[in-house]
Amino acid sequence: MDQDVAEEILNKEYEVVYEGKRFLLKPAKAWVLQPPGKPGVIVALFKLPNGKTVRKVIARLPP
């Protein structure tokens, strides 16, 4: 990931739905997951107010 793109992803708030509740959170960590021969996705870790950590796909990369 380009440095500017990575910084933009980490500073943006995303809507995370967990157990029927919606949260607007900034990711704690994000990375690209791209299996060979398939389009990739950007996965992020979010820390919920109750202390749990959840993963969510926040973007899809072009093939």
Curated annotation (Swiss-Prot):
Keyword DNA-binding: yes
Keywords: Chromosome, Cytoplasm, DNA-binding, Methylation
Keyword Lipoprotein attached: no
Organism superkingdom: Archaea
Cellular component GO terms held in the UniProt record: chromosome; cytoplasm
Chain ranges passing through the membrane: none
Post-translational modification: Methylated at multiple sites, to varying extents.
Main location: cytoplasm
Localization per record: Chromosome; Cytoplasm
A molecular function GO annotation: double-stranded DNA binding
Role of this protein: A chromatin protein, binds double-stranded DNA without sequence specificity. Constrains negative DNA supercoils.
Complex and partners: Monomer.
Family: Belongs to the Cren7 family.
Name under which the protein is recorded: Chromatin protein Cren7
Native source organism of the sequence: Pyrobaculum calidifontis (strain DSM 21063 / JCM 11548 / VA1)
Gene assigned in the entry: creN7
